[in-house]
Every structure is written in structure tokens, then in C-alpha cells.
Swiss-Prot record:
PANTHER family linked: PLASMINOGEN RECEPTOR (KT) (PTHR13411:SF6)
Membrane spanning residue stretches: 53-73, 79-99
Originating organism: Homo sapiens (Human)
Keywords: Cell membrane, Chemotaxis, Inflammatory response, Membrane, Plasminogen activation, Transmembrane, Transmembrane helix
Extracellular side of membrane: 1-52, 100-147
One term under GO cellular component: mitochondrion
Name listed for the protein in its UniProt record: Plasminogen receptor (KT)
Cytoplasmic side: 74-78
Localization (cell): Cell membrane
Pfam families named in the record: DUF2368
Quaternary organization: Interacts with PLAT and PLAUR.
Keyword Glycoprotein: no
Length: 147
């Protein structure tokens, strides 16, 4: 009688472990998908912000360029055109971010760094572990208890 009971109990435990493993895997997959979607939404917001900024800055740049050019012609001082140079760099950067290939180039550079420069990505003192977190937590709680 005990043998039959323990056999069914072992089978039940095995099924329970498989279910828990499958459940943990599903939870991890959901978490990874959620993080990926959050990252995509943040990137979409960044691109949308850049495009919106470009509209306002483009208008400002156009008005500034016309005004500075008119001032340089009227006063016969080409020095009035100097502010157009840094403003054009900002305009070009924002256009490249919003409509160009800046994000693809940055992604490619990041992939290259991940492949060829792993040593630069190492955390100081190595990987964070459960033990290091517990040690810091205990030290911090001891600090608050002593005071």
C-alpha cells in the first residue's frame, strides 16, 4: 500500500515540478516581452520628440538665418552669419535623429562594442550577486538600528 502511495506521490511531485518550471519560463518570457515593448515605446517617444523639436527648431533656424543674412547684408558685416554655423549643426543632428540613420548607426556601434570591447562593459567589483546585496542590506539595517 505504501509503495503505491509513494509512487503516485512521486509522479505528482514530478508533474508539479514540470508545471512550476513551465510557469517560471512563461513568466520570464512575458517579462522579456514587456521589457522589449517598453524599450520600443521609449525609443518611439524619443524619435517623436526629436521630430517635434525639429519642427520648432527648423522654424527658428529659418527665421534666424533670414534675419542674420539680412542684417549682414544691410550692415555689410559678414560676422552676423557666424551664429548660423552652430545652429546648423544642431539642426542637422536633430534631422538625422528624427528622419535619418543616426539610430541605426548608434545601434551598429553598440553591437560592435558588445562584440569587440567586452572588457569596457564590466562592472566595478564584478557582477552583482544575491550575497553582495544581502551584505549591503544587513550593513545598512545595522546602520539604521545603531542610530
Amino acid at each position: 500500500m505504501g509503495f503505491i502511495f509513494s509512487k503516485s506521490m512521486n509522479e505528482s511531485m514530478k508533474n508539479q515540478k514540470e508545471f512550476m518550471l513551465m510557469n517560471a519560463r512563461l513568466q520570464l518570457e512575458r517579462q522579456l516581452i514587456m521589457q522589449s515593448e517598453m524599450r520600443e515605446r521609449q525609443m518611439a517617444m524619443q524619435i517623436a520628440w526629436s521630430r517635434e523639436f525639429l519642427k520648432y527648431f527648423g522654424t527658428f533656424f529659418g527665421l534666424a538665418a533670414i534675419s542674420l543674412t539680412a542684417g549682414a547684408i544691410k550692415k555689410k558685416k559678414p560676422a552676423f552669419l557666424v551664429p548660423i554655423v552652430p545652429l546648423s549643426f544642431i539642426l542637422t543632428y536633430q534631422y538625422d535623429l528624427g528622419y535619418g540613420t543616426l539610430l541605426e548607426r548608434m545601434k551598429g556601434e553598440a553591437e560592435d562594442i558588445l562584440e569587440t570591447e567586452k572588457s569596457k562593459l564590466q562592472l566595478p567589483r564584478g557582477m552583482i550577486t544575491f550575497e553582495s546585496i544581502e551584505k549591503a542590506r544587513k550593513e545598512q539595517s545595522r546602520f539604521f538600528i545603531d542610530k
